């Protein structure tokens, strides 16, 4: 059975760029009848927090992703240590003693000579006495993985045949001098131990994959299938980061965007499919073929998100908006009629709040065209108001004044709402009610 994973670090809020791999993995699991694992890569003890870990779960739930399995990298240190010991015993993990300053000076010398800035494996030439002397100075080793000087290739789910020339890479540091692990080794160990069959992640990990394939092989573990998708950028083509709060999933949720709109744009942009609002995950899973994702960066444009969200709102039945309308203070006995009256003018549910204030007042009316207003007052029908009240009333005003089109409707809109634009007044008038409408037509704030 297919088992995919999404492995964020709980060091900040997820942004829309994180949503893309999370969704692509979840959709691939649905498409293949597989399972989805949420693994928190929380080995960075200084920056990882439980608050961010909880926020990740909330954000995924908002997107509609319910993990089948859960794991924490920090709970698997013993397995990481055992793997490191095996690599040491096999001669594939070796100690290095250079300081960051020494490595930087060496890198600059290489660049000055026109050489690639690759680690020269000087630590492998140290004798036992030299290592002991360095440790006597107080130096503690960091540990590098000894890469085999060969090309690693794989059949990528997105890119097709892919390869990395490991001979052109520095041996990667797997363990810091303080004994903590960098991303590379724990990720491989956990993928192997937890039975991950497919690793779907951003194309910025392609070089990592070449390295990690060698680590899988050195540990005698099965190598998963890899897929590297294009990355989301801002509308200006800049990379996304956790610092872009307005594009964090938390920020988008609090701003009133629909998860279906966010899902659709995050996944369909940069794919072979046209970008449109897809309401459910199963339909979206059927549309997303990893092999048809573009190689070019995919731009996430908030203006496009607004358009998708508006289309969802315009078709949203009251039952889906009811709880949020209640949160806005709109009473249940009037909320459905209100929602049906205003939704066509909204791009997000919270935008309904100002229109409720227009309904309930007070509104400062703007009175123009005295003849139209006078006829409106004289012909204002008795309650109850219904769906046909507006048409019957405006027909009578037209008969009395000869006003039509904008000359008829704009004075009434300004008097009843104080605004030049807004929802269809046929829906708003019954909500405003006769008494309040009469007061506004007389020029009173109501």
Swiss-Prot record:
GO BP terms: namely:
glutamyl-tRNA aminoacylation
Q: What InterPro entries does the annotation carry?
A: aa-tRNA-synth_I_cd-bd, aa-tRNA-synth_I_codon-bd_sub2, aa-tRNA-synth_I_CS, aa_tRNA-synth_I_cd-bd_sf, Glu-tRNA-ligase_bac/mito, Glu/Gln-tRNA-synth, Glu/Gln-tRNA-synth_Ib_cat-dom, GluQ/Sye
Just give the chief location class: cytoplasm
As recorded in UniProt, its EC number(s) are 6.1.1.17
Q: For the motif 'KMSKS' region, what are the positions?
A: 239-243
Tell me the Gene3D superfamilies matching this sequence: 1.10.10.350, HUPs (3.40.50.620)
Which PROSITE patterns would you find in this protein's record? AA_TRNA_LIGASE_I
Sites binding ATP sit at 242
Quaternary structure, per UniProt, is:
Monomer.
Q: Which family does it belong to?
A: Belongs to the class-I aminoacyl-tRNA synthetase family. Glutamate--tRNA ligase type 1 subfamily.
Function, as annotated: Catalyzes the attachment of glutamate to tRNA(Glu) in a two-step reaction: glutamate is first activated by ATP to form Glu-AMP and then transferred to the acceptor end of tRNA(Glu).
Q: What is this protein called?
A: Glutamate--tRNA ligase 2
Q: Which gene encodes it?
A: gltX2
């Amino acid at each position: 059975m297919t088992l995919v994973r999404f492995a964020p670090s709980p060091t900040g809020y997820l942004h829309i760029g994180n949503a893309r791999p999370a969704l692509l993995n979840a959709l691939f699991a649905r498409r293949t009848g597989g399972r989805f694992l949420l693994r928190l890569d929380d080995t960075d003890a200084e920056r990882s927090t439980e608050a961010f870990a909880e926020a990740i779960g909330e954000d995924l739930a908002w997107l509609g992703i319910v993990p089948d399995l859960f794991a924490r990298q920090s709970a698997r240190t013993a397995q990481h240590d055992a793997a490191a010991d095996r690599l040491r015993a096999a001669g594939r993990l070796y100690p290095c003693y250079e300081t960051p300053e020494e490595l930087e000076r060496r890198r600059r010398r290489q660049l000055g000579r026109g050489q690639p800035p690759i680690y020269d494996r000087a630590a492998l030439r140290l004798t036992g006495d030299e290592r002991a002397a360095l440790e006597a100075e107080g130096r503690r080793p960091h540990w590098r993985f000894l890469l085999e000087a060969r090309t690693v290739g794989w059949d990528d789910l997105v890119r097709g045949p892919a390869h990395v020339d490991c001979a052109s890479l520095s041996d990667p540091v797997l363990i810091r001098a303080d004994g903590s692990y960098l991303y590379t080794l724990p990720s491989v160990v956990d993928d192997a131990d937890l039975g991950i069959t497919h690793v779907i992640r951003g194309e910025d990990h392609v070089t990592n994959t070449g390295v990690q394939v060698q680590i899988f092989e050195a540990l005698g573990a099965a190598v998963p299938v890899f897929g590297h998708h294009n990355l989301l950028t801002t509308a200006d083509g800049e990379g996304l980061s956790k610092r872009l709060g307005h594009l964090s999933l938390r920020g988008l949720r609090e701003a009133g965007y629909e998860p279906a709109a966010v899902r659709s744009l995050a996944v369909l942009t940069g794919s072979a499919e046209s970008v449109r609002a897809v309401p459910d995950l199963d339909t979206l899973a059927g549309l997303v073929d990893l092999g048809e994702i573009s190689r070019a960066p995919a731009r996430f444009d908030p203006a496009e998100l607004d358009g998708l969200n508006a289309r969802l709102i315009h078709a949203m039945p009251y039952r889906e908006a009811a709880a949020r309308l209640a949160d806005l203070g709109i009473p249940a006995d009037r909320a459905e009629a209100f929602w049906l009256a205003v939704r066509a003018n909204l791009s997000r549910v919270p935008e309904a709040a100002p229109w409720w204030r227009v309904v309930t007042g007070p509104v400062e009316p703007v009175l123009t065209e005295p003849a139209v207003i006078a006829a409106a007052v004289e012909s204002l029908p008795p309650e109850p108001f219904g769906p046909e009240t507006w048409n019957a009333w405006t027909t009578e005003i037209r008969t009395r004044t000869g006003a039509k089109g904008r000359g008829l409707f704009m004075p009434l809109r300004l008097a009843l709402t104080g605004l030049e634009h807004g929802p269809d007044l046929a829906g708003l008038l019954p909500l405003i009610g006769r008494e309040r409408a009469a007061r506004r037509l007389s020029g009173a704030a109501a």
